[in-house]
Every structure is written in structure tokens, then in C-alpha cells.
From Swiss-Prot:
UniProt superkingdom: Eukaryota
Cited PANTHER family: GLYCOPROTEIN HORMONE BETA CHAIN, LUTROPIN SUBUNIT BETA
Family indicated by similarity: Belongs to the glycoprotein hormones subunit beta family.
Disulfide bonds: C29-C77, C43-C92, C46-C130, C54-C108, C58-C110, C113-C120
Organism of this sequence: Carassius auratus
GO terms for MF: hormone activity
Pfam family, one: Cys_knot
Quaternary structure (record): Heterodimer of an alpha and a beta chain.
UniProt-listed InterPro entries: Cystine-knot_cytokine, Glyco_hormone_CN, Gonadotropin_bsu, Gonadotropin_bsu_CS
Location relative to the cell: Secreted
Protein name: Gonadotropin subunit beta-2
Keyword Transmembrane helix on entry: no
Originating gene: cgbb
Length: 140
């Protein structure tokens, strides 16, 4: 093996080791405590509460060559097992159901994003964002 090839092999090895080392410092995909806001059309206040959501790093890869005949799938940290809890929103007028149900993450998984249950956008609102007046109510 010539000197340029040896240098490339060493350089490639260093890059691989750095990539592995960096990924070991990223938080894994797991349930974490988060403050979220729940609100409902017709009710004047939103409720801010504590729950668990899925958050963390999932290994992904992007192909160098993108064929028009293949699809690229990126895995995201999303819910595996959930429990649903229901709370009552304050000051809802008569005729508006004051109850709202929200998910509590029990376990998480790196898998394809399901838009029915997850926000998979690049930039979304913060989980505790309210359109209406806030009322803090901490639930664990």
C-alpha cells in the first residue's frame, strides 16, 4: 500500500471513530418529562401540564446518490406505547365539552413518523404554546 492510500485509510478510520464517539453523546430516544399546553376551540383557557413525550436521537442516513426510483426513509423518535389521560379545561361555556385527552409516552422507538400522532415538522411551535389564556396545572 502506498503512502497516499495509507493516509486515506487512517483519515477514514479517524472520521468513523469520531462519528461513533459523537453519536454516543447524543441523548437516546426515550420518554422525557415535558410541559405541554392543551386547548380546545370554544374554551377560553388552555391548560399547561406535565406529561412524558418521546425525545432523543435516532440514527439516520442520507444516500449520496438519490435514485428517482427509490424512497428515502428517515427514522424519528416517536411513541411505541402510550397511555391516554383526560383532563377538564376550565371555564368552558355550556354546550362545549370541557374534556380533552392527551397521550402520555410509556416507551419510545426510532421508527417512521406517523403524522396522525406525531409532529414531524422541522420547525414547529413549542409544546407549551397557547393560543388562549394560560392556566398552569401540573400533572405527572
Amino acid at each position: 500500500m502506498g503512502t497516499p492510500v495509507k493516509i486515506l485509510v487512517v483519515l477514514f478510520s479517524v472520521i468513523v471513530l469520531l462519528a461513533v464517539a459523537q453519536s454516543s453523546y447524543l441523548p437516546p430516544c426515550e420518554p422525557v418529562n415535558e410541559t405541554v399546553a392543551v386547548e380546545k376551540e370554544g374554551c377560553p383557557k388552555c391548560l399547561v401540564l406535565q406529561t412524558t413525550i418521546c425525545s432523543g436521537h435516532c440514527l439516520t442516513k442520507e444516500p449520496v446518490y438519490k435514485s428517482p426510483f427509490s424512497t428515502v426513509y428517515q427514522h424519528v423518535c416517536t411513541y411505541r406505547d402510550v397511555r391516554y389521560e383526560t383532563v377538564r379545561l376550565p371555564d368552558c361555556p355550556p354546550g362545549v365539552d370541557p374534556h380533552i385527552t392527551y397521550p402520555v409516552a410509556l416507551s419510545c422507538d426510532c421508527s417512521l413518523c406517523t403524522m396522525d400522532t406525531s409532529d414531524c415538522t422541522i420547525e414547529s411551535l413549542q409544546p407549551d404554546f397557547c393560543m388562549s389564556q394560560r392556566e398552569d396545572f401540573l400533572v405527572y
